[in-house]
C-alpha cells in the first residue's frame, strides 16, 4: 500500500485542546459525492478504509485514524470484506448518514 491511497482524501488533524498535540486524523473525501448513488458511496467508503489503513501503518498505530462509512455501505458484503482485509489497530470507523 502506498501514499496514493490518500489521493482522494483530505487529512484533518485532531488536536488536544491544551497542548495542541496531534491525537489523530480524520479522513474527509475531497470530491463531491452523489448521495443518491449508493454504489458511489460504497466505493468511497471502501477507499476510506484503505486510506485509513495506510495512515495507521505509517504512524505505527500510535494515532487514531477516523474514517466514515454510510450506514447502507455496512450492509454490503463488499464493504464487510474490505473492512476485514484492511482493519488494523488505530482505525476508528464512524457511521454517518450522508443524505
Descriptions of predicted regions:
Residues 84-99:
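The catalytic core of metal-dependent phosphodiesterases that act on cyclic dinucleotides
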Amino acid at each position: 500500500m502506498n501514499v496514493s491511497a490518500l489521493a482522494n482524501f483530505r487529512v484533518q488533524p485532531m488536536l488536544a485542546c491544551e497542548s495542541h498535540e496531534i491525537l489523530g486524523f480524520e479522513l474527509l473525501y475531497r470530491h463531491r459525492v452523489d448521495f443518491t448513488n449508493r454504489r458511489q458511496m460504497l466505493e468511497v467508503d471502501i477507499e476510506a478504509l484503505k486510506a485509513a489503513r495506510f495512515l495507521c501503518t505509517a504512524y505505527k498505530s500510535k494515532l487514531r485514524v477516523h474514517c466514515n462509512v454510510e450506514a447502507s455501505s455496512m450492509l454490503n458484503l463488499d464493504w464487510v470484506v474490505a473492512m476485514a482485509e484492511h482493519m488494523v489497530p488505530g482505525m476508528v470507523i464512524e457511521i454517518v448518514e450522508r443524505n
